Amino acid sequence: TCTVLGADSAAPEFLSLKEDIGVVLDEAYFPESLNALQVGGVMAKTYRRWDGKQYQNYLTRFGLPEKKPFKDFSRGMKMKLAIAVALSHSPKLLVLDEATSGLDPIVRDEVLEIFNEFTREEDHSILISSHIVSDLEKLCDTIAFLHKGRLLLCEEKDALREEYALWHG
């Protein structure tokens, strides 16, 4: 088992944690026929703390069309919609799985800035899986290396930089 936000994954209360977790995968999965406004409507029924105004602010900030079907979104637009959804229910933890892979550099920088804004709140954290070292450098305080499901190393980013000279900041 594991512990997430203080709850054991085997405990019954673990299921209630969905309210505190936002997830962005390497692909955005929404029904293709829905538009951004309809996705927001579905999420409002899914999350008790859904903030429609915040969601609308993200749609505007990202320049996402409200009535265009999801199937017609570009990859960058799909990722931005997934991020808007993940952030619009006041999560404490963001789980990001290759959330910036395949994005053009301008969109990636914009997305990373939003994730940085999220972590400025004291009770907010990000768990990120990425092969893009520059993204890890921009977002992470602590880095863990996994290989075949085993934890090989877990240290603060600055200590890794000093001890192993893995990258230069």
Kindly label every feature range from the protein language model.
Residues 108-122:
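Helical segment within the ABC ATPase nucleotide-binding domain
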Residues 123-132:
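Conserved H-loop
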Residues 94-98, 103:
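Catalytic Walker B motif of ABC-type/P-loop ATPase nucleotide-binding domains
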